[in-house]
């Protein structure tokens, strides 16, 4: 399932980052289907790892500034996803294309659930925080 606008949180920088994740997942799935492209997966896996860490730091910083409740639970979910990326890298290092495809699909589903159920909970307080900040800067 690719990106659609029902995943938007109406937080511009976060929505753009979420869209970028879907592009990475789409590219990983396409390249993994053809073993000749297997080596091309390495830079995408690195990008996924780096981008995930940047994105999670962005989300977490916004949640702290907006005084979002239950932030510890949210951060714990982020840590679980980062552990999955480590498992993903291990599957890649063993050239296990079946496991790799299962990992890509799992991470994409996890990410989709995380956006639609978990991230959505912080959207309103972060939007209010950003609106107040914009008013102060005017």
Language model: regions and residue ranges:
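Small-residue-biased structural context
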Residues: 1-138
